[in-house]
Design a protein with these regions (language model features):
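Nucleotide-activated donor-binding/catalytic signature segment of Leloir-type glycosyltransferases, i.e.
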Residues: 222, 268-310
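A charged, aromatic-enriched C-terminal amphipathic alpha-helix characteristic of glycosyltransferases
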Residues: 380-421, 436
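Aromatic "clamp/platform" in nucleotide-sugar-dependent glycosyltransferases that forms part
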Residues: 323
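A conserved catalytic-core segment of Leloir-type glycosyltransferases
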Residues: 2-3, 29-31, 36-107, 292-293
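Conserved donor-binding/catalytic core segment of Leloir-type glycosyltransferases
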Residues: 216-217, 221-238, 244-247, 257-259
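Donor nucleotide-sugar binding/catalytic pocket of nucleotide-sugar-dependent glycosyltransferases
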Residues: 146, 159-214
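N-terminal subdomain of nucleotide-sugar transferases
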Residues: 1-53, 135, 424-425, 430-451
């Protein structure tokens, strides 16, 4: 197959939110196969020569924030709001076409911008651009609007039905868990494939000890301090108060609770409440203030800053008490770094992940005495901890490795462009023993770009 130019589109590709992390993993796989990747968003930390920055595309742009304030939590919208939505849609549509033309894009990958309506004008502009240009598109869905209470009451149902997501013949839809697949089909009639979040389990992480030690000093950790790591953004659905409760019950001043990520898109009130809650319960809480970079981002812009790879080595235990997750990046990262963890039985975990056979400390919405006892047992027993983390790494290697992603992306590219490789093997998707058949069929002409 001839190398393709692939354009990633979202409101933001920056930092270590789940969408940005997964997009970089996809891009890494594509680049390994000789394809070129380019980036369109309202906030970017990618290679500037391969980026198309449009500030109006960011979900936190003032005009978009004003629109969201007018249409969510309300049942009617004014003509003024509609006019602004379409003005932004028109601008972004022009910018999208410029992006496609400048980098000669063959395939669009839309990361969550046709899924959750944080930026309605961007979703509308994407739907129209994809329909008019007929450009091959993968819509990668992380969390749908019907999964979030904040979007339940709205004044934009017409736009949601049109673009979140659109039903077009040149779009292949990808979801990250089975419930999303079923709900998407039930609500819209759209079929999809499941590609879970993955990590490179074929290659264990390489850690920079010097940078890791510098990070430890930067948050004033003493040599004998023990780190309970909460590797998530600070938003309500992460259930971080349960991590505070756990550290309190450990009753050992050496244990420090460290939150590695920044606040999310829901404001700072929850972070302020957590600080007060930890203080009231006598828990030493450290929120990392330094910007944490994405370890898969090869731009090098953050060479003087820390990545997740500098943080995980210091963790003695991981807390992941989320109420809801699309998949669970922190879970798979903890397994990758061979760290024991406490996880809440959120729906996707209970349905898609738990049956795989991981060895974890699991809570069911509340922190019981038995759960605290099991955490203490693991912290105090190196032998038990080693057995647990090795089991988890082996299980994850079978189900959540790059091999799974590599084969799925290759199959979709083949369907779009009718390249010379055809799958014949019935071996599991993560098997390296994929057999290909070379064909001499000429590929059809590429899509026609809109003028």
């Amino acid at each position: 197959m001839k190398n393709k130019n692939i354009g990633f589109v979202s409101t933001r590709f920056a930092g270590i939110d789940g969408v940005s992390l997964e997009a970089n993993k996809w891009a890494e796989i594509y680049k390994q196969h000789g394809h070129n990747c380019f980036w369109f968003a309202g906030k970017l930390d990618r290679d500037p020569e391969r980026s198309f920055l449009v500030p109006e595309a960011h979900f936190q742009h003032p005009k978009n924030q004003w629109i969201n304030e007018q249409v969510f939590g309300k049942k009617g919208r004014t003509h003024t709001v509609t006019e602004l939505i379409h003005a932004l849609r028109t601008l972004l549509k022009i910018k999208l076409q410029q992006f496609i033309d400048r980098f000669n894009i063959d395939l669009l990958i839309v990361e969550n911008a046709l899924t959750i309506p944080l930026h309605i004008p961007l979703g509308l502009s994407l739907a129209e651009t994809i329909a008019e240009s007929e450009i091959p598109t993968i819509a990668h869905h992380h969390d749908f609007y019907w999964e979030r209470d904040r979007f339940a009451v709205n004044a934009v149902n017409d736009y949601l039905r049109m673009a979140f997501p659109p039903k077009l013949p040149n779009i292949k839809h990808v979801v990250i868990h089975s419930e999303a697949q079923e709900q998407l089909a039930l609500r819209t009639g759209i079929s999809s494939i499941i590609i879970p979040n993955v990590l490179d389990f074929e290659n264990p992480p390489l850690m920079n000890t010097k940078s890791a030690d510098t990070f430890r000093k930067s948050i004033d950790l003493k040599p004998d301090d023990k780190v309970i790591l909460q590797p998530t953004r600070i938003i309500r659905r992460k259930g971080i108060e349960q991590a505070i409760a756990l550290v309190k019950e450990l009753r050992d001043p050496r244990y420090k609770l460290v939150i590695s990520h920044e606040t999310g898109d829901e404001g700072h009130e929850y972070a302020e409440w957590l600080n007060d809650y930890a203080l009231d319960h006598g828990v030493d809480l450290r929120m990392v203030k330094t910007q944490i970079a994405d370890p898969w981002n090869g731009n090098g812009k953050y060479h003087s800053q820390y990545t997740l790879w500098n943080i995980y080595p210091h963790a003695d235990f991981i807390t992941y008490p989320s109420i809801y997750e699309g998949f669970g990046n922190a879970f798979i990262e903890a397994v990758y770094f061979k760290k024991p963890l406490l996880i809440n039985r959120y729906p996707t975990f209970a349905r898609d992940i738990e049956p795989r056979g991981f060895d974890l400390v699991v809570m069911d919405g509340f922190l019981s005495k038995r759960t605290v006892y099991k955490v203490k047992e693991i912290l105090e027993s190196p032998k038990l901890r080693e057995k647990m983390v090795n089991t988890n790494y082996e299980v994850a290697s079978r189900y959540y490795s790059y091999g799974v992603l590599r084969n799925q992306l290759s199959a979709m590219m083949n369907e779009f462009f009718h390249g010379p490789e055809q799958y014949l093997s019935h071996t599991p998707l993560d098997s390296p023993n994929i057999i290909y058949l070379e064909t001499k069929k000429e590929p059809p002409p590429t899509h026609q770009k809109a003028l």
